Amino acid sequence: ANRVLLVVDGVRMNNAIYRSGHLQNAVTVDPRTIERVEVVYGSSSVGYGSDALGGVVHYFTKTPRINSKDKIKNSFSSNFNSANQSFVNHFDTELSFKNWASYSSVSVSKFGELKMGKNRKHGYQSWGLVPFYSENNTEAYQELPSENNNPNVQKNSGYEQIDFLQKFIVKLPNEKLFTLNIQLSNSSDITRFDKLNEYKDGALRFAEWNYGPQKRFLISPQFKFFPKKKFFYKGYLTMAYQNVNESRINRKFNELGRSTQSENVHVWSFNGDFETKKTVKTSFAYGFEWVKNEVVSKAFSQELILNGNEIIGKS
């Protein structure tokens, strides 16, 4: 299912539980920290491995500059979107000294419910409307669907997310650089809007259908060295550990059984990339990669214990 390979700062993000669609994984890379993105198609993508035949999307996050004129540089931005009542607040700071530098970033995002346009030029006036929705959540139980006061609003489509990045770079003797890269992304429950609007026998089928909090943690030390020899002009050694958590929770209307499936993936990787001295006509690169995935998968069902409309426990 890994049709496209996602890479961040030289570390592959694809792991044992990746599926065909990578959008839910791409959003764990904070766009406000991206310095550039490289998209590789065709035969060039083979250099990333056999699972990159569908192409590669390589994210490069911002790197602090050593010995910059601006020793301390702070930045803050706040965005508001009226269409879905979303807020995104971002703060970052960069420290630059003679032999080392630091870049710190944190983003807090809150996305509200999406709102459709009311003008349907295609003539199907009821297309996409949401007349009913589920008000069920982890703490509240509702036996029946609720009526939507504004059917153009896609109920249960909002979520929250926080992203953190810390990067240190240290200048070592003999033209070497050491970089420590730490990334953390954590979301709230993310509902499956399509599943919560699935009908069976004229009624909504699911009272709950959520992706549990999606968490991605990355720590990656990297060494860069520049021997400047003919067959070993420069090289990179990148080690990384990633911890990824994903889960799915669902329950049907008129049922108390809630099904949960959770996955926790530990990924260790080590790769080396080397280049020879480039000439006008030729360039040559070579390297190696080692990756280990350890998956812990659990699936279980629990019966809800109710006190009126309040969920007070599970059995």
State the predicted function of each range.
Residues 212-216, 259-315:
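Outer-membrane beta-barrel transmembrane domain signature of Gram-negative proteins
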Residues 13-42:
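Short acidic/polar hinge/loop motifs at secondary-structure boundaries
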